[in-house]
Amino acid sequence: MATKLFPKFSQGLAQDPTTRRIWFGLAVAHDFESHDGMTEENLYQKIFASHFGQLAIIFLWTSGNLFHVAWQGNFEQWGADPIHVRPIAHAIWDPHFGQPAVEAFTRGGASGPVNISTSGLYQWWYTIGMRTNQDLYVGSVFLALVSAIFLFAGWLHLQPSFQPSLSWFKDAESRLNHHLSGLFGVSSLAWTGHLVHVAIPESRGKHVGWDNFLTQLPHPQGLTPFWTGNWAAYAQNPDSASHIFGTSDGAGEAILTFLGGFHPQTQSLWLTDMAHHHLAIAVLFIVAGHMYRTNFGIGHRMSAILDAHVAPSGRLGAGHKGLFETVNNSLHFQLGLALASVGTICSLVAQHMYSLPPYAFLANDFTTQAALYTHHQYIAGFIMCGAFAHGAIFWIRDYDPEQNKGNVLSRMLDHKEAIISHLSWVSLFLGFHTLGLYVHNDVMLAFGTPEKQILIEPVFAQWIQAAHGKAFYGFDLLLSSSSSSASSASQTLWLPGWLDAINNNQNSLFLTIGPGDFLVHHAIALGLHTTTLILVKGALDARGSKLMPDKKDFGYSFPCDGPGRGGTCDISAYDAFYLAVFWMLNTIGWVTFYWHWKHLTLWQGNVSQFDESSTYLMGWLRDYLWLNSSQLINGYNPFGMNSLSVWAWMFLAGHLVYATGFMFLISWRGYWQELIETLVWAHEKTPLANLVYWKDKPVALSIVQARLVGLAHFSVGYVFTYAAFVIASTSGKFG
């Protein structure tokens, strides 16, 4: 008999008489493949419709950002003096605030308590040509409408007559063409248009709005140079080095340039360089979007490209044969590829936002730079771990050995021992040597003989920096040598700006590196290789191992295979993912510690502190963590409070959540079952409480679920603790 209980998508679970019904129901709510009566076509349709919901949420969120800044922020005041005014994210209304708290949080020229924005939104909006609260309100309303349209589109595509067919979802060539040309190409072209028609004129003090955008020419010669082939005209007369952003002082006329380096006043990339970059990207991607064969029988078939990829030496077996069908029929494979790409891009965003700041005055807002770097690195870590999780699910659910005989996929499985053992060897080598150097240096400092430290100059990295034009090290080669052909070739184009930027100590482009950087670089390499080892081993052993050849029959996550098969605990692909996330967090901890400490000393003008203290572990613990958390911990104390108090509280709360994680990670199923049964007994024996009964028999979480709960608390607590530390220690010093 069908039951109406949760979960509706699984009658088997809905009829479970224990609390397992709830926990397992939550666990598989998004595992659409496993739901009752799910067909492949319906699966694709459900996921497709959910994408519209996702986009609606994103647009609503961005609309909210615009709305709150327009309503409660100080965008216009900030635009008048971006260096000295602190940008306001939104007002705070908190009935717990006493007078000291009200005063502490009233800043940025506001009349009451506010939060300061550390997202970089003010800098972005200002750079792209927004100047008034009115601009922000209009953008907010527009995005709210877009959000509503996407919600409607999601609903519409669930209606039978508007549900695309399975063949439409599997038409890879059409999808690639549209995504390359439309998503990347045309959107980049549109962005170039916005930069050229709105942002660049605004940066030169000319307002372009809905009232005059059709009459205000972005370039005095209009389209004439385009039609006559005199494209160089668009690069002539760029903004001068004395240009004051947002005014006509020192402004030029060029719209597409290749100046290199930064705008001296805003310390951000030249807007005209960025317009040129987006135009080039647009052309490339629009061309790329015409590569695959669809309607007119011209262009390439993807399956033909892949089938032709067979190494002539024969050493790679069947090469890419069979990959098209495998990838096109596996959502997990596609998701794995997408997550790996997006994760990598997200990490690249973190690196480039500070080294090549694209937004005006972003380089002057240290707290925002620290927040953006940390945010993008953590997000990248989680996303990239997800890539391997779905890769493992692909091996278990979607991989067909017959279809992939002898190709690169089957060869990965065939020599997985070599792959895993090499990763293991690299991790061991990096771990022992790096830790050995750090510990040796610690001991030397403890014994009062710092001169006996082992300090290794990163000569190869310095050589690479010199090749790119950094003169500090005295390597006379390539771009750091004025006589090299590399230097002379681009001297008139982008080099003057680039060389000026790379040799300027006020920015973060190619920071000077030494022995401390060498050590932490290898510590990070250790973390990356160990994380990769655990994830790759989990995926490559997901179908089976010598110990458990039939592992794939047990699915992605299983606790233990019962009595008589000892040693099958902890070896599911999920267990590998679970372990890898700890290593990922560990690694990103080292990455962000390094970035943050290096920059704190750079911004404070005492780089020697990092250089001298980063070569031994006590230096990191004492001069980075301890020294920089003291202000934060004193956000409130017996003598009062200041504006860091919220971060002090979050720092404590983060530690609490993090510590809760260990409770689930260390004590497993039996402990919880006994505890629950004791609580149930107490409940039943207590007057009043015994009037309340529940139908489900309480059953403790399985070890797989307890690990998820533990991991979630560990991760959330870890991120909250460090986020509070980064923002408080940076804003406490620089405001």
UniProtKB/Swiss-Prot annotation:
It is found in: Plastid, Chloroplast thylakoid membrane. PROSITE patterns: PHOTOSYSTEM_I_PSAAB. It is a multi-pass membrane protein. Keywords: 4Fe-4S, Chlorophyll, Chloroplast, Chromophore, Electron transport, Iron, Iron-sulfur, Magnesium, Membrane, Metal-binding, Oxidoreductase, Photosynthesis, Photosystem I, Plastid, Thylakoid, Transmembrane, Transmembrane helix, Transport. [4Fe-4S] cluster binds at C560, C569. The chain crosses the membrane at residues 47-70, 136-159, 176-200, 274-292, 331-354, 370-396, 418-440, 518-536, 576-597, 644-666, 708-728. Chlorophyll a B3 binds at M663, Y671. One of its GO terms (biological process) is photosynthesis. It is an enzyme of class 1 (oxidoreductase). The PsaA/B heterodimer binds the P700 chlorophyll special pair and subsequent electron acceptors. PSI consists of a core antenna complex that captures photons, and an electron transfer chain that converts photonic excitation into a charge separation. The eukaryotic PSI reaction center is composed of at least 11 subunits. HAMAP family: PSI_PsaB. PsaA and PsaB bind P700, the primary electron donor of photosystem I (PSI), as well as the electron acceptors A0, A1 and FX. PSI is a plastocyanin/cytochrome c6-ferredoxin oxidoreductase, converting photonic excitation into a charge separation, which transfers an electron from the donor P700 chlorophyll pair to the spectroscopically characterized acceptors A0, A1, FX, FA and FB in turn. Oxidized P700 is reduced on the lumenal side of the thylakoid membrane by plastocyanin or cytochrome c6. This is Photosystem I P700 chlorophyll a apoprotein A2. The lineage of its organism: Eukaryota, Viridiplantae, Chlorophyta, core chlorophytes, Chlorophyceae.
